[in-house]
């Protein structure tokens, strides 16, 4: 896979454009500030009221409505939650799109699953740093960067890829490296990773381990330490050097248990379920379910959230974390 760096991107492609950042949240604040510091003209679309509006003002922007930002801009980056993008696009952005504009996204959900259907005379691109916004901003100010991925869904101008690469340079990503993907690949792999591994898989693994120990008569506090608290120690090692570094860093006892017992937890049945989850994503079943849930008031979603917060592991963890002076309160 080709990796694109500073010399591959031409920031001048953005010099005569106004970039609208729609949503001043986790990613929005980093994109807006980094682009501005790279010499790009930026307007922030953020509804009045709330912390993000005030934060944008603190950072030297004069936030306006999404509609006004879209009207002023030549490149519109939508960095809102997936479930609200389609409505904001329909009501505020689409009426203000001009032929030749660039519509940009940090995640491909609404384009891939056809919740947003841009006109044929605009470019549709993606530029997505592979890290949280605070890290995107901090590394930029330190002279480094978080790597990013870019994609093109619609190339009306014939320059969409180059514009996406220029945008990635504007937020600093070409300092570390930029990879090309597609909206389909980014969306489907992102959803799968969240559901099967990073969020869904890990959450259920932690809870199942905790419950197994507690049901066997062990103290909940000890079960919490062994099944949840120590995850960070292992994840940090994996993050820094992959599974190999983690295994090099743990005891032989732990490594032997990893290699011999791990496959009994994540077994052929688990892998079959992963394949089913991926198929549901690929066929749009998950997207339809998620969209319907949001359109009907999120009653089931809210109930699941409430049940999760009432789990014993949350109560135990809340008490134990009071003992941890290094955690931010």
From Swiss-Prot:
Active site (record annotation):
107
Entry keyword annotation includes NADP: yes
UniProt cofactor note: Binds 2 magnesium ions per subunit.
In this chain the KARI C-terminal knotted domain maps to 182-327
Report the leader peptide range: none
State the top-level EC class.
Answer: oxidoreductase
Which residues does the annotation say bind Mg(2+) 1?
Answer: 190, 194
Name the HAMAP family on file: IlvC
- For the ligand (NADP(+)), the binding residues are 24-27, 47, 82-85, 133
Residue positions annotated to bind Mg(2+) 2 are: 190, 226, 230
Q: What biological-process terms (Gene Ontology) are attached?
A: isoleucine biosynthetic process; L-valine biosynthetic process
Q: Per its UniProt record, what PROSITE patterns does this chain match? A: KARI_C, KARI_N
Its annotated function is as follows: Involved in the biosynthesis of branched-chain amino acids (BCAA). Catalyzes an alkyl-migration followed by a ketol-acid reduction of (S)-2-acetolactate (S2AL) to yield (R)-2,3-dihydroxy-isovalerate. In the isomerase reaction, S2AL is rearranged via a Mg-dependent methyl migration to produce 3-hydroxy-3-methyl-2-ketobutyrate (HMKB). In the reductase reaction, this 2-ketoacid undergoes a metal-dependent reduction by NADPH to yield (R)-2,3-dihydroxy-isovalerate.
Q: Which UniProt keywords apply?
A: Amino-acid biosynthesis, Branched-chain amino acid biosynthesis, Magnesium, Metal-binding, NADP, Oxidoreductase
Catalytic activities: (2R)-2,3-dihydroxy-3-methylbutanoate + NADP(+) = (2S)-2-acetolactate + NADPH + H(+); (2R,3R)-2,3-dihydroxy-3-methylpentanoate + NADP(+) = (S)-2-ethyl-2-hydroxy-3-oxobutanoate + NADPH + H(+)
Cofactor(s) this protein cannot do without: Mg(2+)
Q: Name one GO cellular component term.
A: cytosol
* SUPFAM superfamilies reported for this sequence: 6-phosphogluconate dehydrogenase C-terminal domain-like (SSF48179), NAD(P)-binding Rossmann-fold domains (SSF51735)
The domain of life is Bacteria
Quote the Pfam families the UniProt record gives.
KARI_C, KARI_N
**Name the UniProt record assigns to this protein:** Ketol-acid reductoisomerase (NADP(+))
E.C. number? 1.1.1.86
Where in this chain does the record put each KARI N-terminal Rossmann domain? Answer: 1-181
């Amino acid at each position: 896979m080709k990796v694109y760096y500073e010399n591959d991107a031409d920031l001048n492609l953005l010099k005569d454009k106004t970039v609208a950042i729609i949503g001043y949240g986790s990613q929005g604040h980093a994109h807006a500030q980094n682009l501005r510091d790279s010499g790009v003209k930026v307007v922030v679309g953020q509804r009045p009221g709330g912390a993000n509006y005030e934060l944008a003002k603190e950072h030297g922007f004069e936030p306006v409505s999404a509609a006004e930002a879209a009207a002023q801009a030549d490149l519109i980056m939508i960095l809102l939650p997936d479930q609200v993008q389609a409505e904001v696009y329909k009501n505020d952005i689409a009426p203000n799109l001009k032929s030749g504009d660039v519509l940009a996204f940090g995640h491909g959900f609404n384009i891939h699953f056809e919740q947003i259907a841009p006109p044929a005379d605009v470019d549709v691109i993606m530029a997505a740093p592979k890290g949280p916004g605070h890290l995107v901003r901090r590394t930029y100010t330190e002279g480094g960067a978080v790597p990013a991925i870019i994609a093109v869904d619609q190339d009306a101008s014939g320059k969409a890829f180059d514009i996406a690469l220029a945008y990635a340079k504007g937020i600093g990503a070409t300092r570390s490296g930029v990879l090309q993907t597609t909206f389909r690949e980014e969306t489907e792999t992102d959803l799968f990773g969240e559901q099967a591994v990073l969020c869904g898989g890990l959450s259920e693994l932690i809870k199942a381990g905790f419950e197994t120990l507690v049901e066997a008569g062990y103290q909940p506090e000890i079960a919490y330490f062994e099944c949840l608290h120590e995850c960070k120690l292992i994840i940090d090692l994996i993050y820094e050097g992959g599974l190999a570094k983690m295994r090099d860093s743990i005891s032989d006892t732990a490594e032997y248990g990893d290699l011999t017992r791990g496959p009994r937890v994540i077994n052929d049945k688990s892998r079959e379920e992963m394949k089913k989850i991926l198929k549901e994503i690929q066929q749009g079943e998950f997207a339809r379910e998620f969209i319907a849930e949001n359109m009907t008031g999120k009653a089931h979603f809210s109930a699941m959230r409430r049940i999760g917060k009432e789990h014993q592991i949350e109560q135990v963890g809340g008490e134990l974390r009071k003992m941890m002076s290094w955690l931010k309160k």
